[in-house]
A protein has these predicted regions:
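Short connector loops at secondary-structure junctions
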Residues: 290-312, 389-393
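Short helix-loop capping/hinge segments that flank enzyme active sites or metal/cofactor-binding pockets
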Residues: 49-69, 250-266, 315-413, 430, ...
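Acyltransferase
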Residues: 2, 245-247, 273-299, 345, ...
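Short, well-ordered alpha-helical
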Residues: 1-75, 105-107, 222-233, 239-242, ...
Length: 641
C-alpha cells in the first residue's frame, strides 16, 4: 500500500500534472510499513489502522521531521515529538506517507507558501480550496487523489471544510476539546481544531476510534488548558465505538433547517450561489426528504448577528456579550503567546522562541501575486516585534476570561436556543456558494470571483469555529458545468458531534455522490500484491533492500540509472521498480538488479516554489518473497526530495 501511494505521488504530484500536495515525504515510511507487515503476519496487529498510509498537514509535529507550517521562516524547524494525533496513529500502526501543503502558518487558503500550493485533481482551472480560508489544501488534494487512505487537516475559519467540499471528501470539525490539538502549530487558539479528511463516513469513523481520546497533557491545546470554561473529556462525549454507530435511519424524523442565505432565497444578503450548486442542493433536499427528514427554510441569526449583515442586527460586542477589547487581545496577545509557547515547547535551539524568528520570512508575498483582500489585515511579522517586547502569559491577558465566556454564551443564545425555539435538530446547507478560479492570485477578475462571500471562505465564515459549533461535511455531488465537487454541511449543538456524524452517514449511504477525480485515474501497473498469510518465525532473516540512483543530463533528456541490492534468504516472486510512477525493466545479476529510465529534463526544471529548488525524480522499489515477506525503498535523484 505504501509503495502504491508513493508511486501515485511520484506520478501525479511531483511530476506529470504536478498537483504538489505532498511536498515532504517520510523517510521512514517503508521501514514503518515493513514493521506493520511483520505484525500483521504474526497476529500482532495494533488495530484496524495498522499499516494504513496517511498524510498530515505541514503544521503537525512529527518527531524528527520539519514542522514549517508552510512558512519560509520555519522551513528547517525540527519537531521534537509527535503531535497528539500523530502519536495516536503511530501507536495504532498507521504509516505516515508525508506532510501536505499549506499557506504560511495556515493564515489563508490558497496563497503560496514555502512549498507553493496544491492544485485540483478535478479541474486544473479551479482552486482545490477556498482562496481566503482553505489552508488544508494539500490534505484535500492528497486524500481525493488517493495519495493516502486519509489525511489530517485543520480548521480555524474553513480550512478543513473548504478543501473537503472542493474534493468530494468527508470533513469533521469537532466541538471544543474533542480532539486534542496539542502539537499542532496554532493560528488563532480560540478557533483552531483538528479536521480529519476521508473519502467516506465509515472511513472517518474508523479514524475517529483511534484519534478521539483523552489527552492528559494540555499544553498547546488552548481550550483544554484554559480554566474558565469547563469542557467535557473526550471519553465523556464520544461513543464507545464510532464504527458501531447505526447510520441507516438516522435522518428519519429529523427536522433540519436550511438557511435561506445559502440557497439563494435571502433577499437581504447577496451570497451569489452558483446555479449548479443550487441544482445539487435541490437533489440533496429531495433525498433528505426521502430519508424521512423534514427540511425547512430558515433565517440564520447566528451568522446575521455575528456579521451584522442586515439592519437591526447586533453583534457580540453590541449586546455586551464580549468586551470591546477582546478581539484585539485575542488576535494579538493570545496569538503571540501561543506561537511563542509552541516554539518553546518544541525546544529547537535554532529557533527557541518567537523573538528569535525572522519576521519578514513568516508570510512573504510571492513575486507577481495580488494582495489579499481581508478586512483589517495585518502583517504577522508584527508578532515577532511584540514578542521581543515581552510575551504575556495567557492567564494574565486582560479580558480573555470574559471573552471566552461570551463566545460560549453567544453560541447558546444565537444558535442552540434558536434551534430549540425553531424545533430544529440541526441545520444543513451547501458547503460553499462557488469555487474560485485557479489564477485568482494573479488575475484581478478571477480574484473578484474568488473573494465573494460564500466562495472566499466556506459558508458560515468565522462563525462555526469561533463559537465552537461542530460540523460534518459530506459530498453533495459534482457540478455539471465545471466538474468540481461541492459538499453538504450538517451543523448542530456543541457536543452533538455523534448525531451529526450519523446524519451525514445516513445521507451519504443514500446514493453515490462522490466522483473520483478525473485527473488522477488508477495507474495500470499497480504495486499491490496478493497477501501471503503465513506467519513468520521471529528468527527468520529480515529482507532488506538497498536502492541507489544517479541522474545524467543529456540535452533535453535525463538518464536515470538504478541499482537495487536485495539481502535475505528466499525466492523473489516480484520485484517492481518505478521512476516517477512508470515501471522500468530491471536486469538481475545475483542479488543485484539494475535498470535505467529516461525522463524529460524539463521535469527537473519545473518550479513549484520561489523559495526552494526543483523536485527530483522519485525512484521506488518493492520486493516480495515467496514466503510473503516484503521490503521497499525509495530515493530522489536529480533534484530535492
Amino acid at each position: 500500500m505504501v509503495g502504491a501511494c508513493l508511486r501515485r505521488i511520484a506520478h501525479y504530484d511531483r511530476h506529470g500534472i504536478a498537483l504538489n500536495a505532498v511536498p515532504l515525504l517520510n523517510p521512514k515510511m517503508f521501514e514503518e510499513a515493513a514493521a506493520s507487515d511483520w505484525r500483521r503476519r504474526n497476529g500482532a496487529a495494533l488495530g484496524p489502522l495498522d499499516g494504513i498510509p496517511y498524510t498530515a498537514k505541514d503544521s503537525y509535529k512529527v518527531s524528527g521531521l520539519t514542522v514549517a507550517a508552510g512558512s519560509p521562516a520555519f522551513e528547517h524547524l525540527i519537531a521534537n515529538e509527535d503531535a497528539f494525533t500523530i502519536g495516536r496513529l503511530r501507536a495504532g500502526g498507521a504509516v505516515l506517507i508525508g506532510l501536505t501543503n499549506m499557506p504560511p502558518m495556515a493564515n489563508g487558503g490558497m496563497q503560496r507558501g514555502v512549498y507553493g500550493r496544491a492544485e485540483s485533481p478535478y479541474n486544473a482551472d479551479y482552486l482545490t480550496a477556498a482562496f481566503a480560508s482553505g489552508s488544508s489544501n494539500g490534505s484535500g488534494t492528497a486524500t481525493a487523489a488517493s495519495f493516502a487512505a486519509f489525511g489530517l487537516g485543520e480548521e480555524t475559519w474553513s480550512s478543513g471544510r473548504a478543501p473537503a467540499s472542493n474534493n468530494a471528501l468527508v470533513a469533521y470539525t469537532p466541538s471544543r476539546g474533542v480532539i486534542s490539538v496539542r502539537g499542532n502549530w496554532p493560528l488563532v487558539p480560540t478557533m483552531d481544531v483538528v479536521v480529519p479528511h476521508t473519502r467516506s463516513v465509515p472511513d472517518m469513523l474508523e479514524l475517529l476510534d483511534v484519534i478521539v481520546a483523552d489527552d492528559p497533557n494540555t499544553r498547546g491545546d488552548f481550550w483544554r488548558a484554559q480554566p474558565w470554561v469547563a469542557l467535557p473529556k473526550s471519553s465523556d462525549v464520544r461513543p464507545p465505538s464510532y464504527t458501531g454507530l447505526e447510520l441507516e435511519g438516522a435522518l428519519r424524523g429529523m427536522r433540519l433547517g436550511v438557511p435561506r442565505m445559502y440557497i439563494g432565497r435571502d433577499t437581504d444578503i447577496a451570497i451569489q450561489t452558483r446555479a449548479s450548486v443550487l441544482e445539487l442542493w435541490q437533489q440533496a433536499a429531495a433525498d433528505l426528504r426521502r430519508l424521512a427528514a423534514d427540511v425547512v427554510e430558515v433565517d440564520f441569526p447566528v451568522v446575521s448577528n455575528y456579521e451584522r449583515d442586515r439592519p437591526g442586527t447586533k453583534n457580540m460586542v453590541d449586546r455586551g456579550l464580549i468586551p470591546k477589547g477582546f478581539a484585539e487581545r485575542e488576535i494579538w496577545d493570545l496569538c503571540v503567546f501561543a506561537w511563542d509557547d509552541f516554539l518553546r515547547a518544541n525546544a529547537d535551539p535554532a529557533i527557541p522562541d518567537l523573538a528569535s524568528v525572522d519576521g519578514a520570512k513568516i508570510f512573504p508575498q510571492p513575486p507577481g501575486t495580488l494582495p489579499d483582500r481581508y478586512e483589517d489585515s495585518f502583517d504577522v511579522a508584527e508578532y515577532v516585534e511584540r514578542a521581543k517586547r515581552g510575551v504575556t502569559p495567557f492567564l494574565a491577558i486582560p479580558e480573555l476570561e470574559a471573552g471566552l465566556k461570551g463566545l460560549e454564551a453567544t453560541r447558546r443564545i444565537d444558535f442552540e436556543d434558536w434551534l430549540d425555539a425553531q424545533r430544529l435538530d440541526a441545520v444543513v446547507f451547501p458547503a460553499v456558494a462557488d469555487v474560485g478560479p485557479a489564477d485568482a492570485d494573479v488575475n484581478e477578475a478571477s480574484a473578484a470571483l474568488a473573494w465573494r462571500n460564500g466562495t472566499w471562505v466556506a459558508n458560515g465564515n468565522l462563525v462555526w469555529r469561533h463559537l465552537g459549533i461542530p460540523t460534518v461535511t459530506v459530498p453533495m455531488g459534482t457540478m455539471a458545468d465545471i466538474g468540481m465537487p461541492v459538499g453538504l454541511t450538517f451543523a448542530g449543538k456543541a457536543y452533538d458531534d455523534t448525531r451529526l456524524l450519523r446524519l451525514a452517514g445516513d445521507f451519504e449511504r443514500f446514493g453515490q455522490r462522490r466522483s473520483r477525480p478525473p485527473r488522477t485515474p488508477e495507474l495500470p501497473d499497480d504495486v499491490f500484491f496478493a497477501r501471503h498469510n503465513a506467519s513468520m518465525p521471529g528468527e527468520t532473516p529480515p529482507l532488506t533492500v538497498a536502492l541507489a540512483a544517479e541522474t545524467r543530463h543529456a540535452g533535453d533528456q535525463d538518464e536515470i540509472t538504478v541499482t537495487l541490492d536485495v539481502a535475505g534468504t528466499g525466492i523473489e516472486t516480484s520485484v517492481k521498480v518505478h521512476v516517477n510512477g512508470e515501471p522500468i525493466r530491471m536486469q538481475r545479476t545475483g542479488a543485484r538488479f539494475t535498470g535505467r529510465a529516461v525522463v524529460p529534463a524539463k521535469g527537473h526544471e519545473r518550479i513549484h516554489s520561489v523559495w526552494r529548488g526543483v523536485y527530483g525524480s522519485i525512484v521506488t522499489a518493492v520486493v516480495r518473497l515467496e514466503d510473503g515477506r516484503a521490503a521497499g525503498a525509495y530515493m530522489v535523484t536529480g533534484g530535492i526530495g
